[in-house]
Amino acid sequence: MAYENILFEQADGVARITLNRPQVLNALSLPLTLELDAAITRCEANDDVKAIIVTGSGEKAFSAGADIHEMAELSQEELERRGKQRGEATWHMATCRKPVIGVLNGLAYGGGALLASTFDLRIGCERTRFRFLAATYGRINSTWTLSALIGMPMAKELLYTGRVVEAQEAKAIGLLNRLVPASELLSTAHDLAKTIAQNTPAMVQGIKELLNEGLGCTWAERMEMERHLLSGRLKPSHPREGFKEFLDRKGRPR
């Protein structure tokens, strides 16, 4: 299958997917999101793939989040339609049967931070930084993933403030499993993925399912709570409002 926005490689039981829009910090356009979703489906259907690595192209960013210029041009109806598609793709990543390792080669902001929080494991380097920015721009996300990773008090702090989390802090609070030099990111990830791939696939997948569903309240229930809140009294703002300063400062891409 040919891709325009991602790169796909497979060897030794491990698939590697690279977000490939470095010119816009690997912003998550809908075409990229759908290609990523299709690649995950491809991995799930292939018994030769035992583990998956997801990373970003370039040295600056894993992903700077949603493609704001793309979203700003849409009507509210189209935003909601595409938002549903994005939500389904995010859910698919979070519940992928096979273990997913995120290689965070740079900043993970907004939707990029949400995507990173759905991975089973995260490996970062000195360039890795997180920002969970939804509240800053009049939206809500990551409520159903982040607290399971770093605990409720810290999740509240990061979601309420949208502040930057540098690599060392991310490792200390559990947002990163491993922190290594940038030059060792991919080799560390591949070694870990190959170790996982040596184990019985059905058992690894069963462990993942049990861990994810054993959090007292299932991810599905927590995500539904988030969706219900956003479709009721807390309507997300349109990108033209939430990202007005960004759009005014950056203008249209050339």
For the regions a language model picked out, list residue spans one by one.
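Hydrophobic helix-cap positions at the C-terminus of alpha-helices
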Residues: A39, C43, M93-C96, I196, ...
